[in-house]
UniProtKB/Swiss-Prot annotation:
EC number of the protein: 5.4.99.27
Domain TRUD: 151-309
Pfam families in UniProt: TruD
GO MF: RNA binding; tRNA pseudouridine(13) synthase activity
Protein family per UniProt: Belongs to the pseudouridine synthase TruD family.
Single GO cellular component term: cytosol
Record's function text: Responsible for synthesis of pseudouridine from uracil-13 in transfer RNAs.
Record-given protein name: tRNA pseudouridine synthase D
Entry annotation: catalytic residues: D77
Keywords: Isomerase, tRNA processing
Annotated catalysed reactions: uridine(13) in tRNA = pseudouridine(13) in tRNA
Domain of life: Bacteria
Length: 349
């Protein structure tokens, strides 16, 4: 993400991020009311220093099913203390106590019956609590807080692209004709390529227009929906933007240029080979909100070089997109585990 433009200029302060697991805490907001009956058991699990797939395998072993039969709303980072929900089909007549899985790194908080399994992306969002250590300029961070509260570019985080951008290297090879037989890996690479093009376009818009300034024509998304429409800027649309009824958006490139504004086509020019490669895959044109606005953002000063940040984000959004506008951070999580994570990376957050 170092090549992407900042909305508020490059931050002055440096800090360490994820020095300990407790420095990065995530609480998944599922937003689902369980039916209390049905063949699917939903489990709320807190994991520390483990990835989502590892916990899914534990649940599968306990239920006597394949890991493919365990579902979850989204992947969560290994390097932190993360609460998330899983589901697995368990016959009503054969109840299982999943608290047997409890250990130093995995704890089952809740177990609920539900009529349907959890699906990827079914959650509402995530609540983050992040501790920054060895902060060199706390005042600069505190001065940026109010600006960041109004929104930051909704960039995809670097974890989407694999270690050292390996997923993008693989994408270039795939577009050049190299076959990728592993279906899951192929999906990860396609997602990374699409996200890269999105980031580059948003970065150009930030540089030339910022996010507060609307263009003559915009493609708007309906809040809480993937539906979008192109329209000229009008008093009505400005009022709808202010109320949160609609949002400005940027393209997730698909099989045609339909839905792109003329300015977006210009910005995508340098990445035409990427757009062509994605288009040949037959992907449906989609949009993603342009501005990421944190919810319930608060900051606590622990000491002269330690700050604790708390905020909520919608599903699919990255805490690092917000963090980079506040501080020049260094990921202090263990290197050897980080290398393993790059192989396990999943497109959903």
């Amino acid at each position: 993400m170092s090549d992407l433009n900042y909305l508020y200029g490059a931050p002055l302060s440096k800090a360490d991020f994820k020095t300990t697991a407790e420095d990065f805490m995530v609480d998944e907001d599922l937003g689902i009311e369980f039916t209390g009956s049905g063949e699917h058991v939903c489990l709320q699990v807190v994991k520390k220093g483990e990835n989502t797939q590892y916990v899914a395998k534990l649940i599968a072993q306990r239920a006597g099913v394949s890991p493919r039969d365990v579902s979850y709303a989204g992947m969560k980072d290994r390097h932190g203390v993360c609460s998330q929900w899983f589901s697995v089909k368990v016959p009503i007549k054969k109840p299982i106590d999943f608290s047997d899985l409890n250990s130093e790194s995995v704890f089952v908080v809740s177990q609920q019956r539900h009529e349907r399994k959890l699906r990827t992306g079914c959650h509402k969002g995530n609540k983050f609590t992040i501790t920054l250590r060895n902060v060199t300029d706390p005042l600069d961070i505190l001065c940026r807080i109010n600006a960041v509260r109004s929104g930051v570019p909704n960039y995809f985080g670097e974890q989407r692209f694999g270690r050292d951008g390996h997923n993008l290297v693989m994408a270039e090879k795939m577009f050049a004709g190299e076959r990728i037989r592993d279906k899951k890996l192929r999906g990860i690479i396609i997602s990374a390529a699409r996200s890269h093009v999105f980031n580059q376009l948003v970065s150009l818009r930030v540089k030339e227009h910022g996010l507060a300034k609307t263009m003559h024509r915009e493609v708007f998304m309906l809040s809480g929906s993937n539906a979008f429409f192109e329209d000229a800027i009008s008093d009505e649309n400005i009022a709808r933007l202010a109320s949160g009824d609609i949002m400005m958006s940027a393209p997730m490139v698909g099989k045609s240029e339909k839905g792109l504004t003329e300015q977006e086509k210009v910005w995508l020019g340098p990445y035409q080979s990427w757009c062509d490669g994605l288009g040949e895959l037959g992907l449906k044109n989609e949009r993603r909100m342009l501005r990421l606005i944190p919810q319930d953002f608060s900051v606590e000063t622990i000491d002269e070089s330690t700050l604790k940040l708390s905020f909520g984000l919608p599903k699919g959004c990255f805490a690092t997109a917000l963090l980079r506008e506040l501080v020049d951070y260094t990921d202090a999580s263990p290197r050897e585990r980080k290398e393993k994570d790059s192989k396990d990376e999943d497109p959903i957050k």
